[in-house]
């Protein structure tokens, strides 16, 4: 397939995954939560007297478990809760930015310009951590929180813009071009023109303009959302039928889909490799400096430098659109993006596709619960177990490695069990089993409230739970997309995958805020795991109500009804 080296445009696109995912895996996921907590602790005092200054990473018995509070913006806040509040605000701002920037990211003229603007703004937010004063001041936690919010928002919006290049890059592939030529030679140009041409006025795929009006994210983002293990998992389901292309048009569409999936999966793998590699290398300076706040700031700053440095090939190699139709910015474009949300959650839609929206309801809770568990566990390890920064980094590495291993092994085990069992092991069953397994983590942690032993009281337990969570988290993401893909009306994949991505981002600010508030009120972040237990257990019966077979039929009926309504309007 083509040459051994990827084309220049693809190499430039891969370079951005290599650059940005380091900031995500290192700064956003590991170092920023710890840094915010430690910066607040440096200006904090032990409750309830609020006279003795707090100590960082002191595992002595007279300090471990004591509540540290810092006065921030005139309010005394638990230092662990402060980090959770900042995370909640950051996720909310991230969701707002993703929705608002969507229409512009779908315009070729703005796509690269926005990508570079957000990339260098985000990298700068990380580099600025190197300029903080060595001594703590009352304003340093606030400034760190602002930079955290900026980093979260710019990273997410830059990924939206980056993924918007994906379909165009797939269409440049040699095999896709050959399939296009074969299709056009059979006189199928009219039917394929909207699929192949990369314009800003036309939607990709077979989605109508009416459907395009309901998109929440750029059309070019959606194939990337679908491609990461989703299509392969959906097709590997023993109950799903693989339809071979019967003509040149289907061959072209199939080749385009496979190429999109290959590029997306390769980009994801490159991003993971760079993230884990740099995270491992950063263990050296963090360990050498004793896990101090300066070592955390240094790691964040180096992540920002990496992001900026390896974005240069992206800046040079990615194509930039020339001024043209739609290149003029208008506030109405942002307004339209928000109007689209209301159309997607209209009662009529919910009534016609009940199983799809029941699944989305469960997904909102589960997605928030999983992501908050990751963040809360890091803060728990730092503030309650007093684990050093190098040890927490090791926890993060264990989670990511376990997630990759399980993402590879679980589909193979599923296929093996399906061939040896009388009843097939469907994607839905695997997802349900994964959710039940994930609920074990808050159950075990909450057991520490009533039992004198266990209940996540030691570092060894944290390492074991990190591996357990990683083994569950990887398949959870893949199989959630796979099950959802089975419930989507044929021909309307982009519309409903955008809703899936939106619900993932928009609701994930609730968990961090709730856990932070509980920790603030009780003085013990362990009580926050009671909330996480609810977030992971309550959706289980909701998810159990999803009837995938019936949902497939509803999706087909919805698509047929939509086509009929469009035909009637044309007449």
From Swiss-Prot:
InterPro entries: Atg22, Atg22-like, ATG22/LtaA_families, MFS_trans_sf. It is found in: Vacuole membrane. It is a multi-pass membrane protein. The keyword Membrane applies. Its main location: membrane. One of its GO terms (biological process) is autophagy. One of its GO terms (cellular component) is vacuolar membrane. The chain crosses the membrane at residues 16-36, 89-109, 127-147, 149-169, 269-289, 298-318, 358-378, 390-410, 430-450, 463-483, 498-518, 528-548. It comes from the Eukaryota. Vacuolar effluxer which mediate the efflux of amino acids resulting from autophagic degradation. The release of autophagic amino acids allows the maintenance of protein synthesis and viability during nitrogen starvation. Belongs to the ATG22 family. PANTHER family: AUTOPHAGY-RELATED PROTEIN 22. This is Autophagy-related protein 22. It comes from Cryptococcus neoformans var. neoformans serotype D (strain JEC21 / ATCC MYA-565). The lineage of its organism: Eukaryota, Fungi, Dikarya, Basidiomycota, Agaricomycotina. The gene is ATG22.
């Amino acid at each position: 397939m083509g040459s051994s080296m990827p084309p220049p445009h693809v190499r430039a696109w891969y370079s951005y995954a290599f650059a940005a995912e380091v900031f995500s895996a290192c700064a956003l996921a590991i170092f920023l939560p710890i840094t915010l907590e430690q910066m607040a602790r440096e200006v904090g005092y032990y409750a309830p007297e609020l006279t003795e200054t707090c100590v960082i990473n002191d595992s002595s018995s007279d300090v471990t478990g004591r509540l540290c509070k810092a006065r921030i913006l005139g309010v005394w806040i638990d230092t662990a809760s402060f980090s959770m509040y900042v995370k909640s605000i950051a996720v909310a701002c991230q969701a707002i930015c993703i929705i608002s920037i969507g229409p512009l990211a779908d315009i070729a003229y703005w796509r690269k310009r926005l990508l570079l603007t957000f990339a260098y703004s985000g990298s700068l937010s990380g580099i600025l951590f190197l300029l903080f004063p060595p001594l703590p001041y009352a304003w340093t936690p606030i400034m760190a929180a602002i930079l955290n919010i900026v980093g979260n928002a710019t990273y997410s919006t830059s990924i939206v813009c980056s993924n918007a290049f994906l379909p165009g890059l797939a269409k440049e592939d040699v095999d896709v071009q050959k399939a296009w030529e074969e299709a056009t030679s059979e006189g199928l140009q009219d039917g394929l023109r909207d699929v192949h041409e990369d314009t800003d006025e036309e939607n990709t795929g077979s989605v109508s303009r009416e459907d395009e009006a309901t998109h929440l994210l750029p059309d070019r983002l959606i194939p990337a959302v679908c491609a990461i293990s989703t299509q392969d998992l959906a097709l590997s389901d023993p109950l799903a039928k693989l339809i071979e292309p019967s003509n040149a048009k289907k061959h072209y569409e199939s080749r385009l889909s496979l190429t999109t999936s290959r590029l997306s999966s390769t980009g994801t793998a490159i991003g993971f490799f760079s993230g884990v590699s740099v995270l491992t290398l950063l263990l050296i300076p963090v360990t050498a400096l004793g896990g101090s706040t300066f070592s955390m700031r240094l790691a964040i700053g180096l992540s920002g430098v990496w992001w900026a440095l390896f974005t240069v090939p992206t800046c040079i190699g990615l194509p930039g659109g020339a001024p043209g139709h739609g290149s003029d910015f208008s506030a109405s474009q942002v307004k339209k993006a928000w109007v689209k949300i209301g159309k997607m959650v209209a009662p009529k839609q919910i009534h016609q596709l009940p199983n799809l929206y029941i699944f989305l309801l469960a997904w909102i809770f589960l997605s928030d619960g999983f992501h908050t568990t990751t963040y809360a566990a890091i803060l728990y390890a730092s503030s309650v177990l007093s684990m050093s920064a190098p040890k927490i980094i090791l926890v993060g590495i264990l989670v990511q490695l376990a997630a990759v291993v399980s993402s590879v092994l679980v589909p193979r085990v599923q296929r093996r069990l399906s061939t040896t069992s009388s009843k097939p092991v469907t994607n839905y069953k695997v997802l349900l089993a994964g959710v039940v397994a994930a609920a074990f983590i808050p159950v075990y942690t909450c057991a520490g409230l009533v039992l004198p032993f266990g209940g996540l009281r030691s570092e060894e337990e944290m390492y074991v739970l990190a591996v357990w969570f990683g083994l569950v988290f990887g398949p959870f993401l893949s199989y959630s997309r796979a099950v959802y893909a089975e419930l989507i009306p044929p021909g309307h994949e982009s519309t409903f995958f955008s809703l899936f991505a939106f619900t993932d981002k928009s609701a994930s600010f609730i968990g961090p805020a709730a856990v932070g508030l509980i920790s603030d009120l009780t003085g013990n972040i362990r009580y926050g795991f009671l909330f996480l237990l609810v977030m992971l257990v309550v959706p289980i019966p909701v998810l159990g109500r999803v009837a995938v077979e019936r949902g497939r039929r509803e999706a087909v009926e919805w698509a047929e009804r939509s086509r009929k309504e469009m035909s009637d309007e044309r007449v």
